[in-house]
From Swiss-Prot:
It comes from Rattus norvegicus (Rat). GO terms for cellular component: cytoplasm; cytosol; membrane; sarcolemma. This is Polyunsaturated fatty acid lipoxygenase ALOX12. Its EC number is 1.13.11.-, 1.13.11.31, 1.13.11.33, 3.3.2.-. The modification Phosphoserine is found at S246. Pathway: Lipid metabolism; hydroperoxy eicosatetraenoic acid biosynthesis. SUPFAM superfamilies: Lipase/lipooxygenase domain (PLAT/LH2 domain) (SSF49723), Lipoxigenase (SSF48484).
């Protein structure tokens, strides 16, 4: 018995409030009390009410909500409810962060994180079991394409659960900026109708509007070997380059290149030889766009690192050797300038395909979706790992669903302008799954495997390792609050089910690629969770943001090639290059889409700065605060370093890393 102060917090998004009447009950260990209030929640408001309750409720366990409606079911987005009452040293927090709609009564448990075996009262165990049963009906797996990771069962964005949808501001920004980009694309096409299109300088006719300062530098310097090599370290795709441990077996050195062979062997001996092998593209069928055949290649690039840290190309073999064909041509920096330039353009086209499909779509978006669906199906809201992960899966299901219906769908953007479209992209993704190993998602392992540790000019590698360590400290801090021993990890049935769901269901039996099917220790759990958070945040930032800078100037990363790869160095002319590069329509669409997808989002939530209060324990707040402080310190370090560089690396500054995959 006594006075209770109840605070109701409504979301600030458009349409978060409701004209419907909301009823509340306080549920304690002894009994429950219906509160006599007339609440019609208003967007962005915190509303407080005082109530005298005649009976002793006991320790508070739940708040119950019921939104009444007659004609219109006006959904309400409730952030949280707090209650301060007799004998309570601090207010009890009841997190919600979801839409309240329909006829039912919603039960919000008190927000203290609890493991399945920690429930002193059976009522919490029954609640989490009921919650998971309902979630498993709502969040169902589906197969988008055989051989690829499972996805959320949704044919379009409207099929998604409401709590996984974009909020209204996000939806409007996404759709209106896309329309603005299409309008700009149309203006560029009209502008070029009566103008020539036979020189590289003619791309200037469409290189206006939405672009970045780095894109301007790429525009000026893209033909330079130094910038070509730099992109393998710190560009849109820093994931393919590796230090050579031997000369690749597919490298064919024709007669007369003995000096090159000696130079390659010297660089190899000195540990300065690197390679980028696009063999994954070999045999992938190229697209046919509006009746016009497009072309693909599977290049091999050999590069050396000079004493100053510059990565410079030594040779390019555009296609792998084929027993039924003459030996592939080996292109060298000493070749006629146009021949060497066209060879580099072919490499950049191949890099576009792998960056977008293997390292962006598969290794971040689809992996994050598996994590998201498994989290919703296996971890109840009271579970500490749910509370840890849920801020990092915001919007991921909708952006991926939109991708499957607009970008990589039949007739979508890839089919319209990309050389792997028309089905080749699905074959490429299926091949790439074999390379999707657990180690490949963990920078300490991946960078060690690729020989890129302690390379001073590898800025992605440096920043990724530091972010991994900062994220790992955060995860370790949270995990050790709730798992005091390895036995508790092994004995958590919900956690073990979540692990199996990711590896065996979502990733389609990925244990043969190193993914765990169970957690045997706190260290193993922490490593896996660090991978999850890193993939959904830092890794996506590194791969996504570069599109705007490196793909805006189309010749630097053409989405498609309209002529087959050259077999002779002497026949390459400017007409050959312009005939190979995308035409006006494809170039305009490439610029539009890469700007739309690569720009910083206006509603961006930086890494670690989510406002949702899923945890209520002061100890967890301290761990999160330390994470934020570590990120701030890293931001200062990166900023200071970048001030000394001609070409700053910005993608992994914590302030530019989004807290989840939202674009």
């Amino acid at each position: 018995m006594g006075r209770y102060r109840v605070r109701v917090v409504t979301g600030a998004w458009l349409f978060s409030g409701s004209v419907n009447l909301v009823r509340l009950w306080l549920v304690g260990a002894h009994r429950e009390a219906r509160l006599e209030l007339q609440l019609r929640p208003a967007r962005g408001k915190e509303e407080e009410f005082d109530f005298d309750v005649a009976e002793d409720l006991g320790p508070l366990q739940f708040v119950k909500l019921h939104k009444e409606h007659t004609v219109v079911d006006d959904a309400w987005f409730c952030n949280l409810i707090t209650v301060q009452g007799p004998g309570m040293s601090a207010e009890a927090v009841f997190p919600c962060y979801r839409w309240v709609q329909g006829e039912g009564i919603l039960r919000l448990p008190e927000g203290t994180a609890r493991l399945a075996g920690d429930n002193a009262l059976d009522v919490f165990q029954k609640h989490r079991e009921k919650e998971l049963k309902e979630r498993q009906q709502t969040y169902r797996w589906a197969t988008w394409k055989q051989g690829l990771p499972q996805t959320i069962a949704a044919d379009c964005k409207d099929d998604l659960p409401p709590n996984m949808r974009f909020h209204e501001e996000k939806r409007l920004d996404f759709e209106w900026t896309l329309k603005a980009g299409v309008l700009e694309m149309g203006l560029k096409r009209v502008y070029t109708l009566l103008r020539s299109w036979n020189r590289l300088e003619d791309f200037d006719q469409i290189f206006w509007g939405q672009k970045s300062a780095l894109a301007e530098k790429v525009h000026r310097c893209w033909q330079e070997d130094e910038l070509f090599g730099y992109q393998f370290l710190n560009g849109a795709n820093p994931m393919l380059l590796r230090r050579s441990t031997s000369l690749p077996s597919r490298l064919v050195l024709p007669p007369g290149t003995e000096e090159l062979q000696a130079q390659l062997e010297k660089e190899l001996k000195d540990g300065c030889l690197f390679e980028a092998d696009f063999i994954l593209l070999d045999g992938i069928p190229a697209n046919v766009i509006r009746g016009e055949q497009q072309y693909l290649a599977a290049p091999l690039v050999m590069l050396r690192m000079d004493p100053s840290g510059k990565l410079l190309p030594m040779a390019i073999q555009i296609q792998p050797p084929n027993p039924s064909s003459p030996a592939p041509t080996l292109f060298l920096p000493s070749d006629p300038p146009l021949a060497w330039l066209l060879a580099k353009i072919w490499v950049r086209n191949s890099d576009f395909q792998l960056q977008e499909l293997q390292f962006h779509l598969l290794n971040t978006h689809l992996v994050a979706e598996v994590i998201a669906v498994a989290t919703m199906r296996c971890l109840p809201g009271l579970h500490p790992i749910f509370k840890l992960l849920v801020p990092h899966i915001r919007y991921t299901m909708e952006i991926n669903t939109r991708s499957r219906t607009q970008l990589i769908s039949d007739g979508g953007i890839f089919d319209q302008v990309v050389s792997t479209g028309g089905g080749g992209h699905v074959q490429l993704l299926t091949r790439a799954v074999a390379q999707l190993t657990y180690c490949s998602l963990c920078p300490p392992d991946d960078l060690a495997t690729r020989g890129l540790l302690r390379v001073p000019s590898a800025l992605y590698a440096q920043d990724a390792l530091q972010l991994w360590e900062v994220t790992a400290r955060y995860v370790n801090g949270m995990v050790h609050l709730f798992y005091q021993s390895d036995d508790i990890v092994r004995g958590d049935p919900e956690l073990q089910a979540w692990c199996r769901e990711i590896t065996e269901v979502g990733l389609c039996h990925a244990q043969d690629r190193g993914f765990p099917v169970s957690f045997q220790s706190r260290a193993q759990l922490c490593h896996f969770l660090t991978m999850c958070v890193f993939t959904c945040t830092s890794q996506h930032a590194a791969i996504n943001q570069g599109q705007l800078d490196w793909y805006g100037w189309v010749p630097n990363a053409p989405c498609t090639m309209r002529m087959p790869p050259p077999t002779s160095k002497d026949d390459v002319t400017m007409e050959t290059i312009m005939g190979s590069l995308p035409d006006v329509q494809k170039s305009c669409l490439q610029m539009t889409i890469t700007w739309h997808l690569g720009r910083l989002q206006p509603d961006m939530v930086p890494l670690g700065h989510h406002k949702e209060k899923y945890f209520s324990d002061p100890r967890t707040k301290a761990v999160l605060s330390q994470f934020q402080a570590d990120l701030e310190n890293l931001e200062k370090e990166i900023t200071a370093r970048n001030q000394q560089l001609d070409l700053p690396y910005e993608y992994l500054k914590p302030s530019r890393i989004e807290n989840s995959i939202t674009i």
